[in-house]
Amino acid sequence: MAFDKDAIIASLKDATILDLADLVSAIEEEFNVSAAAPVAAAGAADGAAAAKSEFDVELTSAGTAKVKVIKAVREATGLGLKEAKDLVDNAPSVVKEGLSEDDANALKESLEATGASVTVK
């Protein structure tokens, strides 16, 4: 059985979007396939399996020694006094982003030593 590609392409050009959607559905049913792109599914699986390399340190609570926490935040971030105080007052807030795991854990330990509650995400 021979077919004329040009004739098929010409009839596809003349078809409406609804006709083309029906055609795709019919082809999926006839050949038991899906029109979904397999690349997208594989890409999502690769992203979930990849190890996390950047971490964010989030101050969840300043605790009772707020002044010590503000000083520690200033040292870690280089922020001014007002900015560091605002960050601590508005907890939960991100202290630093994009750190390596070791740096994030070191910052977490130094902030927790001042009495703050900290999470690494």
From Swiss-Prot:
Gene name linked to the record: rplL
Protein family according to the UniProt entry: Belongs to the bacterial ribosomal protein bL12 family.
Subunit: Homodimer. Part of the ribosomal stalk of the 50S ribosomal subunit. Forms a multimeric L10(L12)X complex, where L10 forms an elongated spine to which 2 to 4 L12 dimers bind in a sequential fashion. Binds GTP-bound translation factors.
UniProt-listed HAMAP family: Ribosomal_bL12
UniProtKB keywords: Ribonucleoprotein, Ribosomal protein
Top-level taxon: Bacteria
Name of the protein this chain belongs to: Large ribosomal subunit protein bL12
InterPro entries reported for this sequence: Ribosomal_bL12, Ribosomal_bL12_C, Ribosomal_bL12_C/ClpS-like, Ribosomal_bL12_oligo, Ribosomal_bL12_oligo_N_sf
Protein's job: Forms part of the ribosomal stalk which helps the ribosome interact with GTP-bound translation factors. Is thus essential for accurate translation.
Species name: Leuconostoc mesenteroides subsp. mesenteroides (strain ATCC 8293 / DSM 20343 / BCRC 11652 / CCM 1803 / JCM 6124 / NCDO 523 / NBRC 100496 / NCIMB 8023 / NCTC 12954 / NRRL B-1118 / 37Y)
Cellular-component GO terms for this entry: cytosolic large ribosomal subunit
Gene Ontology MF terms in the entry: mRNA binding; structural constituent of ribosome
GO BP term (any one): translation
Taxonomic placement: Bacteria, Bacillati, Bacillota, Bacilli, Lactobacillales
